[in-house]
């Protein structure tokens, strides 16, 4: 892992809605590190050390049950803050954060973040906005998981969500599917075998096409027709 100061271009991308003074304050408190694939930033039930700001790459947030099963809550990309709720509340991290690919991540210690929030209403509002976004995202994901009647509907919801996230608003589009069938199963609460069977069925019905890691959805409305709730 290589540690270095925050790259200004990444700062503009991640902290672009903050004033120059607020960005500078955060930069001075942050240590940025390049992590390899599979690095654990923090673990579920671990005492909070600080927050992690994803500058580049992708990070998986997951929780584990007593039976050993894993549920992926979401995949985080550049611009998101991880661990803020635990740091502010002084409670254990509620999930495990693991890099999905080589990633550049900034770390700000708990004491430094709280100090910055007390001293700057702008930074406090910025953190609060991220917490609100996380809450809304969690509610939406719980709704999708609980109100879907079948694994097929959950998979359709997930793929339509990928289109929305990528900004594809047309009736057809393509996205990068950088998850294994096992990881997709962990996102929708089913087995790898079920995911493989469903994807094969979707292809047979021409609901999706796949070229390597590129997922093509030729008819969004056809895929959405599987979503009942």
Regions found by a protein language model. Name each.
Residues 14, 39-102:
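Cyclic nucleotide-binding regulatory domains
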Residues 22-23, 74-136:
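Cyclic-nucleotide recognition modules
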Residues 51, 73, 105-106, 176, ...:
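A residue-level structural signature of the nucleotidyltransferase/glycosyltransferase Rossmann-like core
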Residues 62, 84-85, 115-116, 158, ...:
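Residues that scaffold the ATP/ADP-binding catalytic core of kinase and kinase-like folds
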Residues 118-189:
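Polybasic "coupling" helices that flank or enter modular domains
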